[in-house]
Amino acid sequence: MASREVSTMIKQGFIADPSLSFSPSRISSPIKLSTASPPLPPPPPPPPNESTLSNPTLFDMMSDEHNRELPRRKSHARVAQILTEFKNGVVYGHSLGPGDVKLTVVGKDGYRVTMDVHRKVLSEKSRFFMEKMNSRREKGVSHMVEISECDDLEIYVETVVLMYSDDLKKKLIGENVIKILALLKVSAAISFDEGVMSCLEHLEAVPWSEDEEETVVTCLEELHLPDDSVTLILQRVSSQPSTSSTRTRTDDIFSKLLTGVLQAKDDKARREMKVLIFKLVREEADYDVSRDTLYGLCHRCLTSLVLCLSEVTTQMNDPGKDRGALMGEIAREADNMLWMVDILIEKKLCSEFVKLWADQKELANLHSKIPTMYRHEISKITAQICVGIGKGRILVNRETRFAVLNTWLEALYDDFGWMRRLSSRSLDRKLVEDGLSQTILTLSLRQQQVILMKWFDRFLSKGDDCPNVQRAFEVWWRRAFIRQVLTEPDEPRLQITLY
């Protein structure tokens, strides 16, 4: 092999055995990949303590060893769990037979993990593996591949396991931003395009803390991804666009149970069964309930809610009509809808409902015609959606997030005082305010400005009867003014290099 080619492969992190020879008698062809990253700058020295440094006690040495060993044990335990699920077929449902590649991943601490994987999966999902393994392909020959000096062995193993997933976006729901960035880096390094796109879509949809915000921007700049894939993400923090058969039967039973609860005549029994059914749904969160079943019930609840409000608008001025009964009818229908939203969030199927709720112009119009004391329960649905988005449990695109606030935010402001006073036990005010704040901060800077300037005027007029999203206001202010002022003199432009 030419020395230039060897040098190129070393730079790419793929080092082949010089004695590599594909023949019927040779069963294994070891390939070694090195993923060592440049050494980090040394940490700042601790405060000087001559006696401690020169004569550490036995207790000091044991404490240091314990502090180093505990994180390693936790990481090794998580890796073992991932591998157990992988081997037991929990992570993937493919019938590929025994693996034809032995993949060994070695951490910087020397910990080694070996997995039996499939050339077909590696080659189809990773262009890096495809190029390197196809160039050495010979019938009847298995491979041994080693990835050494891994900064985070757990992430490398999990990324390989994710190649077997049929729904990456769903798999990533609930993961924190730092974990997603780690998966993104490894996916980009091995040209796992589906993994890269799923991580980017996740980052665009979930909120970031201020610390995470800087980490996200830095990471995307370092990875040199194509412009189109990161532009939408970076618009959140920059006003300038970046350049850069049994199942069916079970489903029927589930549908009947939900319908029974929604139509229950006894309120006490209804409340008890709501708690029980939701508890069972939460315990079996991975059970793939038919989306059509859940959304069929959601549409039924929405229709009932619209009809209920239509009737109330014609009857609320009727002196012979019991106003308490009117309020009870609306509260019941709204509570049914809210319960269904909770189930959709738990089943990770709520994205479509957010679009549906944003499109309820007729319902929002009827809502505005009814006194607040009757209608305020409906705004709990909007509040719950914001909490779900704010916690990263509902992933929808930016247009949908803005649309749902555009349709329902004024109603939530109007109803918040009644929600706070009459639902003090069931309404977690801080949770709602945090969820609303985080939802607002996932929008573009211009959208954040439009919403928060209106909120500012409303809050000064209503005080405690308006959700307090001061935290969102502070973050927006720093993004829009302080951050822009600090970067304006140099007129920075994110540079993306295509490889």
Curated annotation (Swiss-Prot):
InterPro entries: BTB/POZ_dom, BTB/POZ_dom_prot. Residues 38-49 have a biased composition (Pro residues). The keyword Manganese does not apply. Pathway: Protein modification; protein ubiquitination. Keywords: Ubl conjugation pathway. Residues 18-30 have a biased composition (Low complexity). Residues 99-172 form the BTB domain. One of its GO terms (biological process) is protein ubiquitination. Residues 18-57 are annotated as: Disordered. It comes from the Eukaryota. PANTHER family: BTB_POZ DOMAIN PLANT PROTEIN, OSJNBA0011J08.25 PROTEIN-RELATED. The BTB/POZ domain mediates the interaction with some component of ubiquitin ligase complexes. May act as a substrate-specific adapter of an E3 ubiquitin-protein ligase complex (CUL3-RBX1-BTB) which mediates the ubiquitination and subsequent proteasomal degradation of target proteins. This is BTB/POZ domain-containing protein At5g60050.
